[in-house]
Every structure is written in C-alpha cells, then in structure tokens.
From Swiss-Prot:
Gene giving rise to this polypeptide: Cobl
Modified residues (Phosphoserine): 31, 34, 196, 219, 256, 278, 330, 333, 356, 447, 614, 924, 1099
Pfam family, one: Cobl
GO molecular function terms attached to this record: actin monomer binding
Name of protein: Protein cordon-bleu
Lineage of origin: Eukaryota, Metazoa, Chordata, Craniata, Vertebrata
C-alpha cells in the first residue's frame, strides 16, 4: 500500500523556507556592490604586461586595470596594425603559467595577468558533406505477446530475425532466452530465426514466453483446485441453508390445522402468495403455512424476494387464533384489491320474472365475454326463464335464443311485416363474414336464424327474447343506419293479442336439445359453413298472404333491437374476433299506414324486371309496369308450400357444402313470379338447369340475380331468393364485383329505367306467323366434351311444351387455347337472348333487337382476337336447309354484306361468351367479358311486323346495369386502296419477297392444290416485281429481267382470274361462309379479291408493253426507298 501523505508544514518551516529563499537575493545584492567597489579600486590601478605578437616579438605595455579583455584586444591590434577579428588574446598568469579562462568583458585588473599572447585565429575547416545515404528500407512489424497485447516497431525486412529478436524482447519486456517467435497463435508454427521477414513473407508474428506460460498454467491449476474445493464446500453450505428452510417450512406446515396445498387465485387466497394481475393459469404461488400472517410477508411478491429474506420465526401456539383473524382480514383486503384490478366475475343469475314478463338482458354479459379468449368457457347459472342448453358444450352465450319464460308452449308465432332490400346477397358469404371467435351452437342455430330478422314483432308476444348478433362488422355504421331507417316501424301501445292467419305465421321451434328430431335435423345439416347457411329447415317459411289486414299494420311494434337498446343503454356490439364495434341504431321512424288502401298494400311487389318493390319506397323507383304484368290474386298456398318443400329437399340432397339451392327443371316460372310474394324475398337460390348447378354449388359461388324479360322464349336463369327468413341485406352485405359497382353507379347516374309495353309480346302473336324453329342439322364435334347437349330443349321445351328457343353451349375443343371461348348460338323466335350464369357469377345480359318478322336470329359469338384460325363459323348448309332464302351469294364481297346488314337492321352486339364448365373453378376469370362480334343475319323478304320491330328498338329493356342505349352498328371498312401503278410498285418494293417464294406459289396454283386466300396472290405479285427489280445488273440485264417479269406477271394474272372460280366450290364443299371483315393492316380474305381485281385489270393494259414496264421499273428504282440499297453500275451505253 502507498504511504500516507506527510502532514502539512507548520509556520516555522514556512519561515525557514522564506528565509532560505531570501538568502540568495541578499548575496546577489552584496556581490553587485562588491563588483562596483572592485571596479572603482581597479580604475586607478595599472598593470605592466608583456605582449607577445603573432610574429613572436615581445613588447612591454602598461594598461589600466579597469579595461576589459575585449577592449584590450582591440587596442593592441590597432597599435600593431592587426585585424582584431582574426586574432585572439591568450592570457597567462605569473603563478600558474597556464592560460586563464575569461570572458570578453572581464576586467584585466581582476586577472593576475603576466603575459598576453596575441595569436591569429586558426580557421576551422568545415568538413565536406559526404554522399547522401539512401534511407534504409523498413517495415512495420506487429508483435503480439501475452495473448492480448500488441507492439508495433519499424525494422528492416532484410535482416534475419535473430538480429531483430533483441529489439522485440526490449519492446515486449521479455527475456530473449524464453521467447519463441510463432507465425500465428492457432497453428503454433515456430519461425526460423535465420530467415528475414521478406523470406518468411510476414509482417506480423507472435512472441510466446515459455516461462510465463508455464507459470500461468501452474497458477491456473491451483485456482481450479481452489475453486473446486470452494464449490464443494459451498454446496454443503447452501444445502444446509435450504434444508434449514425446508425444515422450518415443514414444521410450520405441521403446526397448522389446515391443508397447506389449498390455494385459490380469485377469492380464496388462504396460504397463497400470488403476483397481482396474474391469471389463475400462470399464477406462481409459494405455499406457506397458514399460521403465517400475510401482514408479515406482505412485501414478498416474487421468489427473488424469498431468496433475499429468511422466513420469520414460527409463532407461538397461543397466538394461532389471533393470527388466523388477522390473516382473514388481510385476505379480504387483498382480495378487494385484486378484484379492482381483475375482470369482474360472472354476475348472479337473473331472478324469476314477475307476473308481468320482463325480458332479461344479457347484452352486457356478451360485451364482457366478447373480450375473453376463444377457448375459455364461462358457465352461467340459468333460471327457468332461459333454456340455453348447448349441443357441443361450447359458449352457451353465443346463441341467439327465442325463449318463452314460464311457458310450456312449443311453438312461438312470430309475424314478419316489413320490407327487405331488393339487393341480392349470398348466404354462403354470411358465414365467412360472421366467423366469430366463439364457436357456433348447432342446437340453437334454427332459433337464431328465425329470430335474426324479425322486422316487426307483435305486441301480443312480449315474451320473445331475442339476443341479436350483427355478423358482419365490415358494414359501416352509416350504411347500417341508412338501411335501418326504412325498416323500423310504428310503435303501437295496444297490448291485446291479435288473431293471426296461420298461413302468415312462421313457426319457430323451441331450442331444446332434448328433442331427438331436432338433433337429427342438426345432423342432416352437416358441418362447416352449411351449419349456418342451411339451418333454415327448422323454420317453415310460408309466403305471406297479401291480405294481411289492418290489424297487423296497426299493431306492429318496434323491432327487438329497439327494446334491447332501451333496456341495456345501447349495448350493441359486433363479434369479429376480439375486436368490438358498437353501432347505435337511430331512433325509430314514425310511419303511418293508411287504413283505407287495398289489401295488397303491405305486400312486397315485384316489377317486370324482377326488382322487389316495397310499399314504403315513396316513389323512389318509377318503373312503368306493362299491362301484361297486371296484379292478380295471390298464388295458392298449397303450391307455394310444395315449392318450398321441394327446395328444402333438394338442398339436403345436393350436399352440405352447397350455399345456394337450385330449383328442379320441371318447375315452371311464369308471370306469377312477378306477383306480390313476400317470402320470395327471403329465398336465395337461382333457377338454372341441372348442368349449371355443380359449378356454382361445388365451390360456393355467390349467386347473382339474372333478370330477364317476362315472356322471353329463351329459358333464362331467373333469380328466386332462397327460403331463409334471416337474410337481412344490411346485416350481410353482398360481395360485389367491380363491374357491378360500375353498373350501379351508371344506373344511378342514368336515372330510373323505362320499359315499353310493346316489348313484351304474347306467344300467340309470333306463333301466327307460321315460321318454324331453326333446327340444327348436325352438332359440331366439340359436343362430346360437354355435358349440356341442348340446354333449352330440356329446360324450356320440356317445361313449356313449345319450341321457344334453343341454346347450345359447347365446351372448349381440344385444339382451342384457354383464352379462346367457345361459341354460343342462341336461336330465338323473339330475337332476344340472355346469357347464363358463369361460374364466377358475373351478371351479364345480352338483348338482341328484333329485326323482321320472319327472321331467324343466328348469334355467332367469337373472341375478337381469335378470328384468324380459331373462329367458330356456322355451317352454310345448315343455314341453307333451315332457311333456303337466307343463303347468301358467295361472290358478293364482305363490304356489301355489311352495308346490306346495316340497312336491314342487322347490328353488331357486344356479348359475352360464358360457359359454366364443370371442371372450371368458380373464381377463375377464364370466362371474362369479351368484346365479341355478334352478327344477326335475317332473311331478305319483308314482313308486316317490321314496323313493330323497329318501334321496339326505341324502347330497349334495362338490366341491373341500367337502361341500355341503342348504338349504331360499327362497320369496319377497309381503307381505300390506291390502284395506281406507282403505288403498286412502291408497295412491291417495300414488302420484299423472293423468286423462290414466287415459283412455289405458282406451282401450288398450277397443281390445283387448296388455294390460299387471294391476298397471298397480291403478295406474290409484289414479290415478283421486287424480284425483278433486285435481279438486274446494268441496263442489259434490266431489259432481260423486265421481259421475264412481264411474262410471269401475265401468268399470275391469269391465275388470279381463275382464283374466284376455284375458291367458290371449295368454300361450298367446306360449308364455310366468307369470314367477317377485320380492321387493317391484316386484309380479310373476302375483301382482297374486290381490291386486287381492279389492280390486275389496270396492270393488264399498262404492263403488257415491255417498254412501259421497263420504264416503270426504272422510275420506281429512281424514286423509291430501295434506291439507297442499289449499287451504282457504270452505264455501258
């Protein structure tokens, strides 16, 4: 240890130091005074000295003693005419006979001077600077030593290591005897000391001290043995301490009267110390003796604290009673503290209701339980007023119950009065939108589905308890309020029960799991999404009679959610995982019902387009109804019951994964479907043929509403809602496609659609024309892959018994690309057609305008990008056999056909080719909307109903996309071709060919093989001209080539004249019509002969003369773009 600092010095020591510091000052002052006195004494004295000159001559001189030695030198040099700068004085003493040392200002009298030598200065010769040596090459050497230290030194790389070793040892402070130089500390390769750094190729090495390592190893061994000994001893010490604790705890536990293993996390905390706010599953408790008071160990909350502190001594047996009392007091205080921090426990069960029934509310319980985890079950005690038994034993409160307290009635009559939004929705999406964290109960699903949409509940049933659950939180609150307002009804204070027609009442079974029939029905429902979407089988949904009297309207009460809102203070919430949304509904709107109106006022009406019309829409839709859709009396109840029963049976037979139910093909939908039927708004299935069902049912595609004209002869898919009383549109928003959003925006922008009554024609009016249905002669080979041989013949002709139309939907042929869509041919007597549902369920309607009375509408749908080789072409023979007068002349060019078609009312319609294949997934956009050319070809003879057809063009039907506008047909006309010789030659120069290609084409034409379209021949002419132009070499060869070209052109012209005659029988053999016109630059085959014939005729008179042909070729060479490629040849003329 360091020695302590000396005490601070005292005052006497400071005085001594001060006096010591003053002594030199006094001495200097005395020496200066003595020097002055000495100067004054020497000023008067003189000295006799002998001066020896440099030449050796001695002189005697008397000098004053007060002169300085330097002044004496100058004076003597002046006397002897010497240079004082080149001479020096050397003074000798008479006593010592040696030169005295002096300073230039030393007084000569103070020196005992006897002889003064005046000598010349010897000039000091400066050494010549030698040659500059080159600096020695050195490198920075890094020396690692003691494993963690480094030293950097600059050494010569060419010197052996044994010469550098002393420098390394001095730098690292190690002894050279025990140092070994290593290349690295990993391999331990020892370096040879006879080699230099350059030879070894290193700039870093490791100096290893053998002696220090040996000492370190020995010390490490000793430390390890010491640690082992200490550890061994410490082990016994720790065990001894822990054993003492264990003995102490055991003794304290033995002294207690209660079981120390009892511990509770919530209310009973006897003998248990838990961390606050910790759940019971993860509570870390330390079991102590119950005799220990919690007041003594209130500071201990973790095990780490127990390690630091020892347990207090056990109390005396006499104080056990007092300790227990204090323990209970501390337990109650701590329990109260934890109750504030933790979630509130389950509330007490509700009391039995008084004689006037009061609806028990569990919304607050649902709000609390919604925040809990999925797997936790909270069992509540229920009284006689609640029957919430669970089939699967999960989450009893997740049901929506409909319970009558203190009653043994099995059925609850509930009347549904109100309106339903006309927008379609998918019941399959309802399950995915309302997929909660809590599991569903199969036993109470039927009651939940039946009581989910009671629009207005009679006041005569105040016992009904409805716990609602809004399944889709994605619907915003504004939209919720907007859809809620027209549904909330007037409140009536009349509590007297009203007699209700049993046909209008839907019966709801009581959710009791003891009923074996209910269990069987639950098993029939299956599992998965069908448990929620198909549980409507327990509700016998009947069509509501439109003769519901004024009693129902007058006694209509508020919906159940308004009662819950008043009772629970607006405790609304959506269950979506663990996130809670609260949507407070607006106040109910007072709606007055007129008593003196017709009986059908309260029913829901369906317009001619299939739209649902509510009596309280206040004129929001002004759709003029045709006379053919006049309101008649309601359909018989028996037929409707059978209709729904068949639907329910088909739903179970089709499998549990189906989300929509299809109607059987034997069911006929006539104009009665447009009459007021209330329960059609609660149904959600689409009438299609059985071939179209698997695609939409297997994958759960959302059904879209296809609205067709009422008396259309073509069997179109008609949207009939599913028998599901829980389908509330504001609770289950439809998953709509982008095209439907655009269509709804367009419909709102365009205004309400109008429909003419002339569009709807009865069946007899067209049957009197005496025209038969166009029968197809032979089906195309693509039919073998399709499961739909004749869609309308099964769905339309078998049902209605008349040949009203036929639809062919062939599947994709093997050679067709996936992007190419098959042809859809619709033969209709009314000139109208509607496309069918695609698997993607995108709504498309195509209305074809009626042309003439005797027309046969042949609709050829093809993809616009696949007209070259993949297009589907109708058979000419079939067309000629079905209607001989409609056979077209093959020699007419396509522009004339298009002009004629435009004049006679034939138009191009944008359609969509959609085929619901069985193997196609529903969401594949393979059958997307395509811009297709649809050519409606009619007969040429006039008809008396042409005026009606033209008048009906003015009033077009509207669809979900809004009113359809009439567009003029767009006919793609080819650009006018310049037939001048110069342009033909320039075109020949631009489009290069070759002689080889030209000859091959000529051989094919001469052999009579199947000839390519005539635009290949025009290209051959250009190739011939270009070959003639490129083949020249000078004027002589040009003349020769031009004559050859003229002969070849003549032969090509002859072949071109024969081409139409050859092409016509080939087309007749193949049965192919001339292809439609396509936009340039690819010239159609039917238009090329009309453009190429004038050119050939013009070139016959012009190119027949070889001189004119040569001149034309020369002009083309000089003025064309090919002149730059030609090489210059000297003229031989």
């Amino acid at each position: 240890m360091k020695a302590r600092a000396p005490p601070p010095p005292g005052k006497p020591a400071a005085q001594n130091v001060h006096s010591e510091q003053k002594l030199p000052h006094d001495a200097t002052l005395g020496s200066q005074q003595s020097l002055v006195h000495l100067k004054e004494a020497l000023h008067n004295s003189t000295l006799d000295i002998t001066v020896v000159l440099p030449s050796g001559l001695e002189k005697q001189s008397v000098v004053s003693g007060s002169r300085a030695v330097m002044d004496l030198l100058v004076e003597l040099c002046l006397q002897n005419h010497l240079n004082p700068s080149h001479h020096v004085l050397e003074i000798w003493s008479s006593e010592t006979q040696q030169p005295l040392s002096f300073k230039p200002n030393t007084l000569i009298g103070s020196l005992n001077a006897h002889t003064v030598f005046l000598k010349e200065k010897v000039p000091e010769e400066k050494g010549k600077p030698g040659l500059t040596k080159a600096p020695e090459k050195s490198v920075r050497l890094v020396v690692n030593y003691l494993r963690t230290q480094k030293a950097v030194m600059r050494v010569s790389p060419e010197v052996p290591l044994q010469n550098i070793l002393p420098v390394i040892c001095a730098k690292c402070e190690v002894s050279p005897d025990h140092v070994v130089l290593l290349r690295d500390n990993i391999a331990g390769e020892e370096l040879e000391l006879s080699k230099s750094l350059n030879e070894l190729g290193i700039k870093e090495l490791y100096a290893w001290d053998n002696r220090r390592e040996m000492l370190r190893k020995s010390s490490l061994g000793n430390d390890e043995t010491d640690k082992e000994k200490k550890k061994f001893l410490g082990f016994f010490k720790v065990n001894k301490r822990s054993n003492s604790k264990a003995e102490h705890l055991g003794l304290s536990g033995a002294d207690s009267d209660e079981d120390p293993s009892k511990s509770a996390s919530g209310g009973d905390l006897n003998g248990c110390v838990t961390t606050p706010n910790s759940p019971s599953l993860h509570s870390r408790s330390l079991t102590l003796g119950p005799s220990l008071s919690l007041g003594n160990i209130s500071g201990m909350s973790m095990k780490s604290d127990m390690k630091k502190r020892r347990a207090p001594p056990p109390p005396s047996p006499g104080l056990l009673g007092q300790d227990k009392v204090s323990e209970k007091a501390s337990l109650s205080s701590q329990a109260d503290l934890q109750k504030k921090k933790r979630r509130a426990p389950a509330p007490p069960p509700p009391q039995p209701p008084p004689p006037s029934p009061v609806v028990p509310n569990r919304k607050e319980d649902k709000e609390e339980n919604r925040k809990s985890t999925v797997g936790m079950e909270e069992n509540y005690e229920t009284d006689t007023s609640s029957l919430t038994s669970s089939v699967n034993g999960v989450s009893n409160h997740s049901l929506q119950e409909a319970i009558i307290p203190d009653s043994g009635v099995d059925d609850i009559p509930v009347t549904f009065i109100g309106e339903v939004s006309d927008e379609p929705f998918d019941s399959g999406l309802f399950f995915s939108g309302s997929n909660n964290a809590a599991a569903l109960n199969q036993g109470g699903i039927a009651s939940q589905r039946s009581h989910l949409p009671p629009y207005q509940t009679e006041q005569s049933q105040p016992f009904i308890r409805t716990n609602r659950k809004e399944p889709d939180p994605s619907l915003p609150s504004q939209d919720y309020r907007k859809r809620n307002q027209p549904i909330l009804a007037n409140t009536s204070e009349n509590e007297n029960p009203v007699g209700i027609d049993p046909r209008v009442t839907s019966f709801v079974s009581k959710p009791s799991t003891d009923d074996p029939k209910a269990k069987d029905k639950d098993k029939m429902c299956g599992s998965g999404p069908s448990e929620k979407t198909q549980t409507g089988h327990r509700v016998n949904s009947l069509p509501v009679n439109p003769r519901v009297g004024e009693d129902e309207n007058s006694n209509s009460a508020l919906p159940p959610w308004s009662h819950h809102g008043q009772a629970s203070g607006g405790s609304y919430g959506l269950k979506y995982g663990l996130t809670t949304y609260k949507i407070v509904p607006p106040k109910p709107e007072m709606r007055c019902y007129d008593r003196d109106v017709s009986l059908s006022t309260g029913a829901i009406k369906i317009d001619e387009l299939g739209n649902l019309m509510s009596p309280h829409m206040n004129g929001s839709r002004t759709i003029s109804k045709p006379s053919a859709v006049a309101e008649t009396e309601a359909p018989p109840i028996g037929k409707v019951k059978e209709f729904w029963r068949r639907n329910s049976m088909e739903k179970y037979l089709n499998g549990p994964a189906e989300c929509t139910v299809k109607k059987a093909p034997s069911t006929t939908i006539t104009a009665t479907s447009e009459k007021p039927q209330r329960d059609e708004t609660k149904a959600g299935f689409t009438l299609t043929t059985p071939e179209q069902q698997p695609a939409s049912q297997e994958y759960g595609a959302p059904p879209e509403e296809d609205r067709s004209r009422p008396h259309s002869a073509v069997s179109c898919p008609v949207k009939v809602p599913a028998p599901n009383p829980t389908d509330i549109t504001f609770l289950k928003p439809q998953r709509r496609t982008s095209s439907q959003y655009v269509a709804s925006a367009i419909a709102k922008k365009m205004g309400p659609p109008k429909v003419h009554a002339d569009v709807v024609r009865p069946h007899k009016k067209t049957a009197e024309q005496g025209h038969e249905e166009a029968k197809l002669a032979r089906p195309p080979p693509a039919w073998k892959d399709s499961a739909v041989p004749n869609l309308c013949s099964e769905a339309g002709q078998c049902e209605h018994g008349t040949n009203q139309g036929s639809v062919r939907l062939p599947s994709n042929p093997g050679g067709q690309l996936p992007a190419d869509h098959p042809k859809v041919e619709v033969n209709s007597t009314y000139g109208k057609s509607a496309t069918h549902n695609s698997p993607a369920a995108v709504h498309r309607n195509s209305y074809f305008l009626p042309g003439r009375s005797s027309q046969r509408d042949r609709v050829s749908v093809g993809q616009s990008c696949g007209f070259h080789e993949k297009q589907t072409i109708s058979n000419q023979k079939m067309n000629s056999t079905s209607n001989p007068s409609q056979a077209l002349d093959k020699a007419h060019p396509a522009p004339l056909l298009l002009t004629e078609a435009r004049d006679s009312g034939r138009i191009l319609v944008n359609g969509s080719a959609q085929t619901p294949g069985n193997c196609e997934p529903p969401h594949s956009q393979k059958e997307s909307t395509l811009t297709s050319y649809i050519i409606l070809q009619t007969e040429e003879k006039p008809s008396p109903l042409s005026a009606d057809g033209q008048n009906s063009d003015d009033a077009l039907p509207s669809s979900i996309f809004g009113p359809k506008k009439k567009f003029k047909p767009v006919v793609q006309r080819p650009l006018p071709k310049d037939i001048s010789l110069h342009s033909a030659l320039m075109e020949a120069i631009h489009t290069s060919g070759g002689r080889d290609k030209l000859r091959k084409t000529a051989e094919q034409a001469s052999e009579g093989r199947p000839k390519k379209p005539s635009y290949v021949e025009a290209e051959s002419e250009r190739s011939a001209l270009l070959a003639a132009i490129r083949g020249h070499s000078g004027t002589l060869s040009l003349r020769k080539v031009s004559s050859l070209a003229s002969e070849e052109l003549q032969s090509f012209r002859d072949a071109a004249l024969m081409a139409p005659g050859v092409d016509k029988p080939q087309q007749e053999d193949r049965g192919l019509p001339p292809p439609p016109a396509l936009p340039p630059p690819s010239t159609p085959a039917s238009q090329v002969p009309s453009a190429s014939i004038p050119v050939s005729r013009f070139s016959i008179g012009t190119l027949s003369n070889p001189v004119n042909a040569r001149q034309a070729l020369m002009d083309a060479i000089r003025s064309g773009t090919g002149a730059a490629r030609l090489r210059k040849v000297p003229l031989l003329v």
